[in-house]
Amino acid sequence: MNVGIFIPIGNNGWLLSENAPQYKPSFELNKEITLTAERYGVDFVLSMIKLRGFGGKTEFWDHNLESFTLMAGLAAVTTKIKLFATAASLVMPPAIVARMASTIDSISNGRFGLNLVTGWQRPEYSQMGMWPGDQFFGTRYQYLSEYIQVLRELWGKGQSDFKGDHFQMDDCRLSPQPQADMKVICAGQSDAGMDFSARYADYNFCFGKGVNTPKAFAPAAEKLIEATRKTGRHVTTYVLMMVIADETDEAARAKWEHYKAGADHEAIAWLGQQGAADTRSGADTNVRQMADPTSAVNINMGTLVGSYATVARLLDEMAEVPGTEGVLLTFDDFVQGVAAFGERIQPLMKSRVHVQSPVPSQAEAERLAA
């Protein structure tokens, strides 16, 4: 199973809590996390794009770096790990994104890929006068379908004359083209989003669900398998999960309860209001899950809480779900969490025995000792 890190491009990572670690994003912080991940053989890092936060006492996501420029910097200081930036498609024309991606492909020597998002939080775009109106919720994947076709044409042949409802290319050129096949990620959860991923993406992200229920996301993975049967393409699932680990299950659970007790209710309320704005996409969108009050303290991503051994076992169970190629991990404390993953969790994972790391897998160590 592949493992990626969802690096903290926004303040406080993914915990809306006064009791969680409080920090601002910086290049140095993300460089430290990425270099640690690379050292332990983690496969990739991905940064989101967020143009306006949720406020509240913790000023959640009010402080953010920009995804492409951050990943360009990380490309220059890494050698092996793959890097994915996120394009806010509403405000970044596809021809410009194609060129930026090709540039980071050059910096990284072919280690770059792209995460495409449609945009769901109206204030991110209305603050710039660039929100197209709430009807966009119902047409956003048609828009993104044209967007990615322009990207693929420019990356593939260096020229596009694409004509659609949203984009009109007139002998648009791109050179140099990427040296590596440019992989594209989407996070489609609704029927329209899943159909888009099955047609155009290489990987589809979905949210994990619940606390210590590692296979609860399986219906989303099966839904993607069904969608790709219609398109005849190979697209795999990656699952977003938060890891809260410690020496014992009890210590990890105490941290989780402490974070929940400090929930930033003002920021959570803002998230709920923004999630309710989309009345056109159905009840199964990612933002609907994010805003659910059940575990909004970490935007309802699946959460693994336990000892290092418990978390390793739960991650291995996730790898057993058909169609699942990997996980995208967040941590309560990224600096400590990524190091603990490499030192204490990954060596216990049966699904990671192939990884080249300074800390060998327990299974490999036992094999060599036999």
Curated annotation (Swiss-Prot):
It holds the Pfam family Bac_luciferase. InterPro entries: Luciferase-like_dom, Luciferase-like_sf, Pyrimidine_monooxygenase_RutA, SsuD_RutA_monooxygenase. Coiled coil: none annotated. GO terms for biological process: alkanesulfonate catabolic process; nitrogen utilization; uracil catabolic process. Its EC number is 1.14.99.46. Transmembrane segments: none annotated. FMN binds at I49, K50, N115, E124, R140, Y141, S190. One of its GO terms (molecular function) is alkanesulfonate monooxygenase activity. This is Pyrimidine monooxygenase RutA.
